Amino acid sequence: MLKQPKGLIAAALANTGERFGFYTMMAILTLFLMSKFGIDGEQAGKIYSFFYTSIYILALVGGLIADRLRNYKGTIIAGILVMTAGYAALMVPTVTSKTVVIGALMVIAFGNGLFKGNLQALVGQLYDNEQYAKLRDTGFQIFYMFINIGAMFAPFAAVGVRNWWLRTQGFLYNSDLSALCHQYIGGTMSPEVAQGRFSELAAEVSLGGVPADMGVFAQSYLNAFNTGFHYAFGVAIVALVFSLVVFLANKKKLPDPKVAAASRTTPSKAEIQQDAREIKQRLYALFAVFAIVIFFWFSFHQNGLTLTLFAQDYTRLEIFGMPITAEIFQSANPFCLVVLTPVII
């Protein structure tokens, strides 16, 4: 790391904070939507997919804005502030409208578009200096290792906040109870389940003793459960404040494309033609990469949707006799990346 340009660690730490906040949200988003609105995995998946589609589309918009303004650092700061506003909207427990939640997700997606790609562009420009050109690949591996450090701990933070709030309200966590509470309140629960499993679980999670009124219990547990989810989104705000402080304190270490462009000499006609041929070759290579990464991200982003639902519904949530939650499985992939990156480089 000591041989890398000075701005790399600063940029990596700023990205670590933002990714910590983002993956805190992604660890719980699907389960939050299902619990908050009483919807099934299919409906939650549509919102999840729409959100992720928006992230990738708005990343292009964020790049166009930064290119037009030639102010990458200002665009990055704006992205952090916009994302903070989106997470703040999700943090409010009184939000009951699905439209408001989707709107907040779109705000986060737009802020992400302003932030993520432009920060990575600045990291790439650190290696335009011939002194560091040979270290580019290693530098990006270090940069992405820092991203995964944030992603690795994020699910634990989300689960910790939710379960802490449940305890303050006199309840323990149970992955099945949210759906059962919705069934009881909606009148779709059979008498056998109401008098059997639902009553048994209610007694298990109630720290104050067996509930006298199951209707009151169902509403109280849902309120506490969903409020815990809302407060978990506040972790993202704290992480973004960290990112903002780190970025502002170190932004002079990062390149300024506007200054670099002003210092360039006017290229000759031959140089322009040569650059055009090189750009065309790079575009061909880029489209080849597109053909691969589309399927990679198609699979990867099942983490927050189908794999989370599979973990909750079809996995024994216990390790060495200790209970775990479905969200924790999302730490497995970044953990492997953090452990293996030093081996690779």
Predicted regions and their residues:
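C-terminal ends and interior cores of transmembrane alpha-helices
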Residues: 78-99, 345
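A gly/Pro-rich, aromatic-decorated transmembrane alpha-helix motif that marks the paired
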Residues: 27, 60-61, 149-164
